[in-house]
Amino acid sequence: MNQLRLEPIKKVSGTINIPGSKSISNRALLLATLAEGTTTLTNLLDSDDIRYMLASLKQLGVSYRLSNNNTVCELDGLAGPLNASEAQTLFLGNAGTAMRPLCAALTLGQGDFTLTGEPRMEERPIGDLVDALRQLGAEVSYLKNDGFPPLSISSTGLNGGNVEIAGDLSSQFLTALLMVAPLAKDDVNIQIKGELVSKPYIDITLALMAQFGVKVQNNDYASFVIKAGQRYVSPGKVLVEGDASSASYFLAAGAIQGGEVKVTGVGKLSIQGDVKFADVLQQMGAEIEWGDDYIISRGAKLTAVDLDMNHIPDAAMTIATTALFATGTTHIRNIYNWRIKETDRLAAMATELRKVGAIVDEGHDYISVTPPAELNTAAIDTYSDHRMAMCFSMMAFADCGITINEPECTSKTFPDYFNQFNSLAH
């Protein structure tokens, strides 16, 4: 097993250019595929999730050209759905941002497809999306356990009509449905069952669809209407914003041990909800400065917060480890969907926080963190989850430092993370 030792860091300062957003990269690749014309995507994220999407698109006959550093992709759109004359099996690793949209997109055309992934992917639910696609006439079946990949799709096109989809587990199901709806045979009316989680991620989807020329009627996130007969048209160029969830670690570093840390590639013009992480740091006492495409975080004495963080589920994880350096008990609420991510993040976070001495209360959909008088060093298990590894790098600001087990799991979104993190140390 690989281990990375992070020695205590007394002060951080510097500037980090954030790699492209995973959410935006994979959405934009799929829309560019379905669109008419050639799209040039810049600042594309170079990571496992994106590589699985690109490999699948290539297997399905999509033509694209990647720059040497894999961050610029020129992709020739199909001006319509993906088709396959022979049966295709696509392996998608643990990439939810590839599995869910492709599952929906492959119901639009003609062909037989099997979607598989790593063992953890077989534990990540997809039933709500499959139920919705079946309501629109899709033929999707489970190859192992009901409600989970691997999946088999026999596609002859998507009918359209009225569809209900649960909104309380993952916004990725709705995102997948929205992106394919314009290419259905009839209008699609989507009714949301329950409270929609992670609304800002839906805003990303709608903003990108608009960039590719498709209009969606959003009725206050309770229902959505997508008219048939629309088509995606390439805007020519798409700049992928920096990943706001990835920015959270550097902003937290500035708040805990700054100095001044500036992240570029995200800012007040960002379409990602996770930039609101900076507002949480501000509530904890950090000094935050916003530009159109940058955020600056400066250190201060931090105090605990008690907040509903459903709108920033990924970045909220960083608050759990930042809480180790704040006075009082921090409560992070309404985060049930942590449990269905790369690992059960609520259980994993509670376990690892206790290792360093924190007093933790883990509930069904919340976590409370009280720092100890003195933090202990530990070897942190990362559960093949990139965000666990990056969150616990904050422990480098304790006097004891920290050891991260299997740090290479950051390759899912940020292969160069620890080099960038160490570049801020002074």
Curated annotation (Swiss-Prot):
One of its GO terms (molecular function) is 3-phosphoshikimate 1-carboxyvinyltransferase activity. It catalyses: 3-phosphoshikimate + phosphoenolpyruvate = 5-O-(1-carboxyvinyl)-3-phosphoshikimate + phosphate. CDD domains: EPSP_synthase. The keyword Electron transport does not apply. It comes from Shewanella pealeana (strain ATCC 700345 / ANG-SQ1). Phosphoenolpyruvate binds at K22, G96, R124, Q172, R345, R387, K412. InterPro entries: Enolpyruvate_Tfrase_dom, Enolpyruvate_Tfrase_sf, EPSP_synthase, EPSP_synthase_CS, RNA3'P_cycl/enolpyr_Trfase_a/b. Its main location: cytoplasm. Pfam families: EPSP_synthase. GO terms for biological process: amino acid biosynthetic process; aromatic amino acid family biosynthetic process; chorismate biosynthetic process. Its EC number is 2.5.1.19. Monomer. It is found in: Cytoplasm. The active site is at D314 (proton acceptor). Catalyzes the transfer of the enolpyruvyl moiety of phosphoenolpyruvate (PEP) to the 5-hydroxyl of shikimate-3-phosphate (S3P) to produce enolpyruvyl shikimate-3-phosphate and inorganic phosphate. Gene3D superfamilies: Enolpyruvate transferase domain. The gene is aroA. SUPFAM superfamilies: EPT/RTPC-like. This is 3-phosphoshikimate 1-carboxyvinyltransferase.
